[in-house]
Each structure stands twice: as structure tokens, then as C-alpha cells.
Amino acid sequence: MKKKQQSSAKFAVILTVVVVVLLAAIVIINNKTEQGNDAVSGQPSIKGQPVLGKDDAPVTVVEFGDYKCPSCKVFNSDIFPKIQKDFIDKGDVKFSFVNVMFHGKGSRLAALASEEVWKEDPDSFWDFHEKLFEKQPDTEQEWVTPGLLGDLAKSTTKIKPETLKENLDKETFASQVEKDSDLNQKMNIQATPTIYVNDKVIKNFADYDEIKETIEKELKGK
């Protein structure tokens, strides 16, 4: 009887340790992907990256984002349209998106697909980009699949679904994705979304007032 009690107590201790470790891992992942970070200052290079706006716009806004990141979805649905209306459409800002892959295989698949769209049908990129974020569900699950990406390409681009799926399988555009990863490392990207206004890192991506004020200061300095 005593041995049985000891075994039960030992099992309870082990179970408690496992639960604590799992909870700690979840906290670390959440902090990495959706909270503040220590990104370095300095203007990120947008050579070869998707760009929306006039080439000679005096201010550059760059989003380091992940298509599977819930906070990135919020930024693109709530904040980005304001930037577009107030600054991009007026020729004051050009906007660029750099892939970050913090959420595993699905993040990489989405990044590969987005790179293909940018290279093969750039005029359709931002529609594809917006619709892909809209596909993100409210609950964590493996939703990014070759089938979904193929269907999205069919409805938003000139790329044939079978062509996109084949390129995903072959990782045809892996070199572009690796360039994004290299830039992430160079800028020490630790969270998504990370937003740059020229060489300034925005502290709170969801605070449009901060973003607007920073853009306006940069415009005055030009």
C-alpha cells in the first residue's frame, strides 16, 4: 500500500513538472511571435521584396510578418488600411512586406507561395497577400496547405493552381525565402509583426497614432 502511494505521488510530481514545462514553452513562443522584441535600428533593405506605392516615396514602411501570426492578421486588417489611405495613396509612403517563419511548415509554405506570386504575377500580389491573411482562422490549426494556396492563387492571380503546387513541392522559390530569413537575422527580428518606419522600429504595431506620428516626423525631416 505504501509503495502504491509513493508511486502515485511520484507520478503526480512528474505530471506537474511536465505541465509547467509545457506552459513555459507556450509563454516563450507567444512572447517570440506576438510581443515586443529587440529588433535593431537601421533601415532594412527591400531589394527584391514586394513593394506597394511610388518608388520615389520619401518614407518606407516595412512589415516583418508571418501569414500564420494572429497579430499580423490584426495589423493587416486594422492598421495597414489606415497607412494606405493616409500615406501610400498620397505618394508619401511605400510599403514592403518581408516573410518571417515562426510558425513552422505552414509559415514556410505561405512564404514560398507569396514569393512565387510576387515573381510571376506582381500585379496580383497584394490581393493574394490580403486574402491569405483573411483565410487565417481564429483558432490555432494547420490551415495553410498546398490546396488552399492553389485555390487562392486561382481566385486572385494568373498562376495556375497546379503550377503553384508543383513549385511548392519543389521549393522553387526557396532562395527568396532564405533571403528573407537572412534579413530577419540581420535585423534581429524576434516578434511578428515588427514594423519599421525608415530606420525607426515601432514599439506597438497596434498603435496607429505612434505609426502616424513617426511617419509624419520622417516626412518633415526629408
Curated annotation (Swiss-Prot):
Give a single Pfam family match.
Thioredoxin_4
Q: What InterPro entries has UniProt attached to this entry?
A: Thioredoxin-like_fold, Thioredoxin-like_sf, Thioredoxin_domain
Q: Which UniProt keywords apply?
A: Cell membrane, Competence, Disulfide bond, Membrane, Oxidoreductase, Redox-active center, Signal
Q: What span is annotated as the signal peptide, if there is one? A: 1-36
| Domain Thioredoxin: from-to ranges | 37-220
A GO molecular function annotation here is: oxidoreductase activity
Domain of life (superkingdom): Bacteria
Cystine connections: C69-C72
KW Membrane (keyword) present = yes
State its location(s): Cell membrane; Membrane raft
GO terms classed as biological process: establishment of competence for transformation
Where does the UniProt entry say this protein principally localizes?
A: membrane
Q: What happens when the gene is disrupted?
A: Cells partially restore cytochrome c oxidase activity in a CcdA-deficient mutant, possibly because the bacteria can no longer oxidize the 2 heme-binding thiol groups in apocytochrome c.
Q: Does the keyword NAD apply?
A: no
Annotated GO CC locations: membrane raft; plasma membrane
Function per UniProt: Required for the stabilization, possibly via formation of a disulfide bond, of the obligatory competence protein ComGC. May be required for the stability of secreted proteins with disulfide bonds. Not required for sporulation.
Q: What family is this protein classified in?
A: Belongs to the thioredoxin family. DsbA subfamily.
The protein here is known as: Disulfide bond formation protein D
The organism of origin for this protein:
Bacillus subtilis (strain 168)
